[in-house]
Amino acid sequence: MTDLIQRILPTVQKPARYTGGEFNEVKKDLNDVRVRVAFCFPDTYEIGMSNLGMRILYGVMNEMDGVWCERVFAPWGDMQQAMEQHGLPLWALESQHPVKDFDMVAFTIGYEMAYSNVLNMLNLAGIPLHAKDRQGLKNIVFAGGVCTFNPEPLADFIDFFSLGEGEESTVEIVSLYDKAKAEDWTKDQFLLEVSKIPGVYVPSFYEHRYNEDGTLAEIIAKEGAPKVITKRIIEDLDNAYWPTKMIVPSTEIVHDRANLEVFRGCIRGCRFCQAGFSCRPVRKKSPEVLYRNAIEMLTNSGSNEITLSSLSTSDYRGLKELTDELIPYCAERHISLSVPSLRADNFSRELMEKLQAVRKSGLTFAPEAGTQRLRDVINKNLTEDEILSTCAQAFAGGWNNVKLYFMLGLPTETDEDVLGIAELVYKVILAWKANATNKKRGLRVHVATAYFVPKPHTPFQWEQQITPEEYLRRCKLLKSHFYSKSIEYDYHAPDLSRLEAVMARGDRRLGPVIEEAVKNGARLDGWNEYFNISHWFDALNTCGIDPDFYTTRGFGEDELLAWDPMDVGVTKKFLLRERRRAYESQVTPDCRHGCAGCGANCLLKEVECDA
């Protein structure tokens, strides 16, 4: 097989995607290995190697005695064509062995439009798609990642899901499999025992029944199966595993840098944001541990860039202390330090000036809505004065590029709100004219609008999505009010976001749709080069599924939702209260101004929420 791979590589784009052999990859002697895990990322090497969760769990599993975790990525179209032409099955990078030879096949799924890749990769591996068709302990397929907070569209294909943060649960799962394999358990025995691990959901243990109108009538748990599956979290991040010897990619990837996670969770509560609610409660790392991790990562990788990551990095309490240590270290070694996920209401002039020593790039902010009324509806907790004041400080400090991200189709949005985006952008331009210290290069304002997708476990999970036609009308309305040459405006095509909404709030009836779409040729749907909406519309029609049922239909507040058994810590009572506050244009202050009672702190047993 290795010889065949070597013959194919010169015929495809970016062959280094498929070779392995990178610096810091993990190799093990098969004589010392009891459990082999194929860790699959359902997208290309460039995307998967940038994924922090994959780097963490790759390290976690390879720290285990007798376990070898290897990486698998979705092939690009030219490689898939070559594989099919030569009868070459999907393989893992480290050993170049076929995925079907592995004990366990794990997926991390962070984007609904990767569902077709999951099935496509199983097909390429020669592994039966349906969980019921895979007998015995060989090729146990499980999945984690944020999409598993509504796992139902993939329920037919995945043996079990692991909800939440996986550093501890993955060790428990793989250790149980090691025991099951040694004792020659049946698959049913293993699934029964793995379902007892907190955070594990076995979909075959649950029956879904529907009303005549298509809504969900009841979810029946089989005897012994938990009725509620509560996500796992890591309480003490200072003592949690961290991958300081990260693999150095052998080809360019999307985020080719050391990635330092400063804290988990979010204090804000933007009502559209799934991560902001599903990743609660807030837990931080100490600046001392972060600084030590940073030095080890940079030393072990030779990287010339490091980023401080989180959902809102400027909300990290220890940011000043950490940057005071890191910036001199990076400056002396010509290492670039980036601090993304900044908010316009707490991005200080002092931090701006310090960052100039190690990075000078464009500023990026996400006001999300153009008017204060709509920003209050979505609980952005950000005023126009704060946006303009921050931009003015940045322009005075020498910045000449700014990116502004907005959404169209948010609940209660009107044309006045849409045009408010244009008004805000022109005020940013005026702020540049009044404050810029270097006007020779001119100003570039990049404006982007996304199509609102209602997501599970948010206050807007019940909302309807506007039609694609209405979304495009609002895009064109906004574009017609951009006259300045300083403005670049991009908007997302609606088809992908509409399909994302179908999958995000979908149920088990979408399994046949995904399977049919893959038969039609769907794969790499997150890439413009490959996404073809006709693959999906044909599949929806064939399976008799109306996409509007999941998109433009508002869900009832008393309706049973497919993801209701998945407990992310935030209560439905809180989400409903936030939804009603949205319609009253009432803001809920961030967690540092007082606990709003979301419920996520109940997940903590040993530490307190750091909000």
Q: How would you describe each model-predicted region?
A:
Residues 75-222, 459-507, 515-529:
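Glycine-rich beta-alpha loop elements in corrinoid/cobalamin-binding modules
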Residues 66-78:
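A short beta-strand-loop structural module common to alpha/beta enzyme folds
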Residues 8-38, 45-46, 203, 209, ...:
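N-terminal [4Fe-4S]-dependent radical SAM core
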Residues 39-43, 61, 248-274, 298, ...:
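N-terminal pre-triad scaffold of radical SAM enzymes
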Residues 51, 252-288, 594-611:
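Canonical Radical SAM [4Fe-4S] cluster-binding loop centered on the CxxxCxxC motif
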Residues 77-78, 153, 207-211, 317-318, ...:
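Flexible glycine/acidic-rich beta-alpha junction loops that bind and position SAM and/or redox cofactors
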Residues 39-40, 44, 113, 296-403, ...:
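Conserved SAM/AdoMet-binding glycine-rich loop
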Residues 1-27, 31-33, 37-39, 483-611:
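Radical SAM enzyme core and accessory elements
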